[in-house]
Amino acid sequence: MFYLFHFIFKTVIFYTMDWEKLSMPEPGSLVAVGMSGGVDSTLVTLLLKEHGCTVVGVTMSSWANDLPLPPSAEGVRGSCYGPDEAIDIAQCKAFCQQLGIEHHVIDVREAYHHHVLDYFKAEYRNGRTPNPCINCNPNVKFGALLDGVRAKGIDFDYFCTGHYATLVRPTEDLRLVYGDEVTGQETVRPVMISAATDKRKDQTYFLCRVPSATLEKVRFPLSVYTKQEVYAMAQERGLAAASRSESQDFIPDTYLDIIFSDQISQPGDIVDLAGKKLGVHRGIHHYTIGQRRGLGVSSNRPLYVHSIDSQKNQVVLCDDQDLLCSGLVAENWVWAGGYAPKSSFKGQVKIRLASPAASSTIRARGDGSYEIIFDQPQRAVAPGQSAVVYLDGIIFGGGIISREIR
């Protein structure tokens, strides 16, 4: 049985706010499901069909077939972008035929190339550490894909995916939470993203840049389940996708050197904080802040990447304690409801997926950027990564880290 839930919970910041969880698609509603061939989206498709929805499967095609095959096929499967895309599409189409529902392939190659591949390469070549998944979600998965679905005349009521996240809406004006003055007749009550039941699979960080307006029609049916429960339900229903490995990266490791082969990598100096040469790097796109392995230098103590200077083509190394930062500045923000807070406020900030959210003070700088000061120093703040502001597990905004504060 497919269970639907509605609940109210509280958080206390400056103002006690109630939040309501968005209801799932009603029986009879037209639902487009973003399908990848994995167990999550496959199960979502079936659950919605069982629930009585009119379901249409949609799969994006991003592989441009413009890269040479890697020397080894090992690791090609299990990534979002790769030459085996046709296998995934065929599996999705076959499953939809089995259910007796429509399936459409949406060409997103141009958008994917621009917003993911070009962005990924440009950021690394500028000495920054990009997050391609965060850029892909608003521009491709919840952007070009939905544009393509609508272009086919599919006027869906809801768009569902297999993401592990929850969608909520404040019961009062969002500005009250920040302590900002509430003016005008329009109430700011946007759709916002909250953690799912399975905290180990939580994907909210990756969704931080999807606009609230887009989220109005989005639903995440797996938000109330753990991954273990998802596998159990898939196995009970005999889904072949239950035996498929999860995708881990957006591109196979074997393709990393290939996608950067459009420009010759320029070796440069590896130096310490004093400027002393320690070795030679093989191209700055091979390095990221906090990296320890694969540096290619000999030392009697552990060394880490402190910073990357694209102008000097240098990789700077340091001791572990030199990675600590008191804060950061982030720009290019996407705030819930498009409302940028004016007041300073307390929140929790994640600076990478694997790190817990750190208690911080968030302050507007007057130029669209925000300064984040941590209560406790944080390690290895990497320009190019996303700083995501949470309050009680709910995303209020996400910005791109422009620099660290030491």
What is the predicted role of each segment?
Residues 1-10:
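Hydrophobic alpha-helical signal peptides and transmembrane signal-/tail-anchor segments
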Residues 12-208, 235:
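ATP-dependent adenylation/nucleotidyltransferase module used to activate substrates
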Residues 25, 36, 160-166, 171-406:
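AMP-forming adenylation/ATP pyrophosphatase catalytic core
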Residues 4, 22, 66, 336-338:
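Enriched - but not universal
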